[in-house]
């Protein structure tokens, strides 16, 4: 079920206006969709934070604009201040509940990989997986247990696909997480590979010195 969030119309969202809005505790935003004309709005930062914590990053939100029409939306894009962590701007996308959409779902790793205790390094290559489904069926996150991964092991999309209840868009060969060998081991392997690839040097026969001319 979608959680309700109130919004205010903001016909003017120029730079000076957006700064003023943020100081008042609001976040500049826009709501749009395939059948919805883009409309600038603002929402209270505190209310938005509570809503996202409740429904998740890909959750459905019932956006009420000044006691008018309610829009069933999802957060399509969220801009944040990298230093302060404040919300700068939000894009709300109005969804058709009967049509499938694509969404990026966060990946959460659980457990401690066996290879890490053996000296390996856990490397997460993908932090989001793209899925396609009805808006109401999009998972909040995809959880992967890495406990059984030894050094050299990895989890690819093909390993994830069967455990996700919706369609995964990514290619099977894409690697989500892997356990790499220790740095020293990797360096030795690299040096060995370089040595093997070096061409063999064939010693050339020295040319006999020219005989000195007889005086």
UniProtKB/Swiss-Prot annotation:
Keywords for the protein's UniProt record, in alphabetical order: Ribonucleoprotein, Ribosomal protein, RNA-binding, rRNA-binding
SUPFAM superfamilies noted in UniProt: Ribosomal protein L25-like
GO-annotated molecular function: 5S rRNA binding; structural constituent of ribosome
InterPro entries (UniProt xref): Rbsml_bL25/Gln-tRNA_synth_N, Ribosomal_bL25/Gln-tRNA_synth, Ribosomal_bL25_b-dom, Ribosomal_bL25_C, Ribosomal_bL25_long, Ribosomal_L25_dom, Ribosomal_uL5_bac-type
Region (Disordered): 174-215
GO BP term, example: translation
Biased composition range(s): Acidic residues: 186-215
One GO CC annotation: cytosolic large ribosomal subunit
Segments passing through the bilayer: none
Family: Belongs to the bacterial ribosomal protein bL25 family. CTC subfamily.
NCBIfam families: bL25_bact_ctc, PRK05618.2-4
Function as written in the Swiss-Prot or TrEMBL entry: This is one of the proteins that binds to the 5S RNA in the ribosome where it forms part of the central protuberance.
HAMAP family named in the record: Ribosomal_bL25_CTC
Subunit structure: Part of the 50S ribosomal subunit; part of the 5S rRNA/L5/L18/L25 subcomplex. Contacts the 5S rRNA. Binds to the 5S rRNA independently of L5 and L18.
Protein's recorded name: Large ribosomal subunit protein bL25
Species annotation: Halalkalibacterium halodurans (strain ATCC BAA-125 / DSM 18197 / FERM 7344 / JCM 9153 / C-125)
């Amino acid at each position: 079920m979608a959680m309700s969030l109130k919004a205010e119309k903001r016909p003017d969202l120029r730079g000076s206006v957006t700064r003023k809005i943020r100081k008042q505790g609001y976040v500049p935003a826009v709501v749009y969709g395939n059948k919805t004309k883009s409309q600038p709005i603002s929402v209270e930062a505190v209310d938005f934070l509570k809503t996202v914590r409740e429904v998740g990053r890909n959750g459905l939100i019932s956006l009420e604009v000044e006691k008018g029409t309610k829009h069933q939306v999802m957060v399509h894009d969220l801009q944040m201040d990298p230093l302060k962590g404040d919300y700068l701007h939000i894009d709300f996308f109005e969804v058709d509940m009967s049509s499938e959409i694509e969404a990026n779902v966060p990946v959460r790793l659980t457990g401690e990989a066996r290879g890490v205790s053996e000296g390996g390094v856990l490397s997460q290559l993908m932090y989001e997986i793209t899925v396609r489904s009805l808006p109401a069926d999009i998972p909040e996150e995809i959880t992967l247990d890495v406990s059984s991964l030894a050094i050299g092991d990895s989890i690819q999309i093909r390993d994830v696909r069967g455990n996700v209840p919706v369609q995964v868009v990514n290619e099977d060969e894409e690697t989500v997480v892997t356990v790499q060998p220790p740095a020293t081991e990797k360096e030795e392997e690299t040096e060995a590979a370089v040595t093997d690839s070096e061409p063999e040097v064939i010693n050339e026969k020295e040319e006999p010195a020219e005989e000195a001319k007889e005086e």
